[in-house]
Amino acid sequence: MTTDTIVAQATAPGRGGVGIIRVSGDLATNVAIAVLGHIPKTRYADYCDFKDEAGEVIDQGIALFFKGPNSFTGEDVLELQGHGGQIVLDMLIKRVMEVDGLRIAKPGEFSEQAFMNDKLDLTQAEAIADLIDATSEQAAKSALNSLQGEFSTQIHDLVEKVTNLRLYVEAAIDFPDEEVDFLSDGKIAASLNGIVGKLDGVQASAKQGSIIREGMKVVIAGRPNAGKSSLLNALAGKESAIVTEIAGTTRDVLREHIHLDGMPLHIIDTAGLRDTVDTVEKIGIERAWDEIKTADRVLFMVDGTTTAAIDPHEIWPDFIDRLPSNLGVTVVRNKADLTGEDLSVTQEAGHSVYRISAKTGLGVEDLKQHLKSLMGYQSNLEGGFIARRRHLEALDLASSHLMLGKEQLEVYQAGELLAEELRMCQMALSEITGKFTSDDLLGKIFSSFCIGK
């Protein structure tokens, strides 16, 4: 970690009512003396002139000084809050840079200083960027929850439980005559099962948080001419796909990225699924299945004029059986304008069934509300936290080590191997908060931040 004193504009570039220059590091007091003529009283707003080297006034505004470690970065911090014209701010940065030993901050470097000085853990630092980039109230609230430590608290709790269990197992190993009794008395198994249950809950919440941040991938799939492209157009609000009465019109994957009340949704229209000898259509169908395998949700599009069935296993058992076991399915019975079906929403064999007319728009709004609900949209904006893909991967890795540990306990009564799996689980979880994290990963994370954060 560098000990350089860094400076950057903390407000967005361009014209604004207020512009803020932030300085962090040991030389912040030197900057204060050079630009202000004095060091402001700690944590007090000091209205004063900002002067150049000749003593001429560049601007007037508020100076704030925070003495480390009681600051955002943990270093001495000086903020100069002046008028928001870009020329004025550039002049002020130029003046600050005349003080020996300063340099311009890299993107995210103020937050990186805070992380390195234990003012934030890595999930909280990432939440700052997520809060800035939030595209909905739900995403903003979830990012704020992460910034305030909701995600971190759950991870720290898991790490503590895993560590305590590991110490208990290692204590049993230290007394080999009693090791088997320790491993078979039920206490370790009960603790391990409790941790597994806790981790499952955190994984579910994290997956929801990832969808709020990154969006949900929804694949529209079904037989040819079921109305898949019409539904894509209805959801997108524009004519993205060509629609004809000819079965097999869509031969490739079509993508649309939309927002429902600010929440990102990635909709994918696919070629109609059927047996075909057409080479191009075959490639399109293969691509459709590739998209289905990585989807968060499948909208199973059914032409309501061809069947009255609502159970997806009855409609097309081969299609349902081929889907990944963990993939959620929503049945969409289309062409309700022709069948005269009631637009009610029902449940069948564990699946939601929607009746719509993609052509006229009947029932599409209800389907949008359903998709918002699946993405975690909450009108009361309570609860939840933001999660990133790296968090999900770390949680999956931790879970796999726990499962291997259970096997070592239940099948082999192997205390040393159980302890090792618990150690690996602990390390995977600790990577989330940054306790065990490579410099390359830190660089990648913080370089995506705004300059000045």
UniProtKB/Swiss-Prot annotation:
Source organism, top-level taxon: Bacteria
Main location: cytoplasm
Regions crossing the membrane: none
Binding positions for K(+) per the UniProt entry: 225, 244, 246, 249
Binding locations of Mg(2+): 229, 250
Subcellular location: Cytoplasm
Cofactor(s) demanded: K(+)
E.C. number: 3.6.-.-
Residues holding (6S)-5-formyl-5,6,7,8-tetrahydrofolate: 22, 79, 119, 453
Keyword annotations from UniProtKB, A to Z: Cytoplasm, GTP-binding, Hydrolase, Magnesium, Metal-binding, Nucleotide-binding, Potassium, tRNA processing
CDD domains: trmE, TrmE_N
Note accompanying the cofactor annotation: Binds 1 potassium ion per subunit.
List of residues binding GTP: 225-230, 244-250, 269-272, 334-337
EC supergroup of this enzyme: hydrolase
Keyword Cytoplasm appears in the UniProt entry: yes
Domain TrmE-type G, residue spans: 215-376
Alphabetized GO MF terms: GTP binding; GTPase activity; metal ion binding
Record-linked SUPFAM superfamilies: P-loop containing nucleoside triphosphate hydrolases, TrmE connector domain
GO cellular component terms given for this protein: cytosol
BP-aspect Gene Ontology terms: tRNA methylation; tRNA wobble uridine modification
Family: Belongs to the TRAFAC class TrmE-Era-EngA-EngB-Septin-like GTPase superfamily. TrmE GTPase family.
Function in brief: Exhibits a very high intrinsic GTPase hydrolysis rate. Involved in the addition of a carboxymethylaminomethyl (cmnm) group at the wobble position (U34) of certain tRNAs, forming tRNA-cmnm(5)s(2)U34.
Assembly, per entry: Homodimer. Heterotetramer of two MnmE and two MnmG subunits.
Protein's name according to its UniProt entry: tRNA modification GTPase MnmE
Organism: Shewanella pealeana (strain ATCC 700345 / ANG-SQ1)
Gene name, Swiss-Prot/TrEMBL: mnmE
